[in-house]
Amino acid sequence: MKVKIEESWKEVLNNEFNKGYFKKLVKFIKHEYKTKKGKIFPPPKLIFNAFDSLPFKDIKVVIIGQDPYHGKNQANGLAFSVDSEIKIPPSLQNIFKEIEKSLKIKTLPNGDLKRWAIQGVFLINTILTVEEGKPSSHKDIGWEIFTDEVIKIISKNLENIVFMLWGNLARSKKKLINPTKHLILETSHPSPYSANNGFLGSNHFSDALNYLKQHNKNKINFQ
């Protein structure tokens, strides 16, 4: 099982990678990929795609998702993202809808959010793998411990980051973030079931850009 991760992250996460729970997690995941060939998403090399897409110090915005898409060919290791040839999922359609309304721009006609990641948007799911057709199938195997630590490390070691917490699971991570150092934006999940409960009309993207500008950080193009 080969995974890719950007060099600066290896240093930042070295302690975590050497902890007992993480070694158990890796053992379990390797077994899953080996015994359920083609049924575990994303492909192994993309598990850490969020970490491989931008250096640690370049993070400006953190968007927290739940677990990867569980349909074939959907998950690509970036929360809410799909490859450019894949139909845009409903939650991401609502994200684009909110961006267009809030920022008065036209989003691109594909769901590959690598274009955001390389500008400093860290798109992290709380669980990094899933079995086909079984949402939350890799819950409580260790991923949440790992991603909680990642959020804490970002909060502790970086300054003036925008954290977008959408839905109850993401909002439960608020306690891991220092509110005196960072901007925390909370609302409902962009899923069709809850987008009208606050997400649509939240203006999170315009709030984020204003905050970045106030702290002399380069603008992100959310198209």
Swiss-Prot record:
Pfam families: UDG. Its EC number is 3.2.2.27. GO terms for biological process: base-excision repair, AP site formation via deaminated base removal. Keywords: Cytoplasm, DNA damage, DNA repair, Hydrolase. Its main location: cytoplasm. Signal peptide: none annotated. The keyword Cytoplasm applies. InterPro entries: UDG_fam1, Ura-DNA_Glyclase_AS, Uracil-DNA_glycosylase-like, Uracil-DNA_glycosylase-like_sf. Disulfide bonds: none annotated. SUPFAM superfamilies: Uracil-DNA glycosylase-like. GO terms for molecular function: uracil DNA N-glycosylase activity. It is found in: Cytoplasm. The active site is at D67 (proton acceptor). One of its GO terms (cellular component) is cytoplasm. It catalyses: Hydrolyzes single-stranded DNA or mismatched double-stranded DNA and polynucleotides, releasing free uracil. Belongs to the uracil-DNA glycosylase (UDG) superfamily. UNG family. Excises uracil residues from the DNA which can arise as a result of misincorporation of dUMP residues by DNA polymerase or due to deamination of cytosine. This is Uracil-DNA glycosylase. The lineage of its organism: Bacteria, Pseudomonadati, Spirochaetota, Spirochaetia, Spirochaetales. The gene is ung.
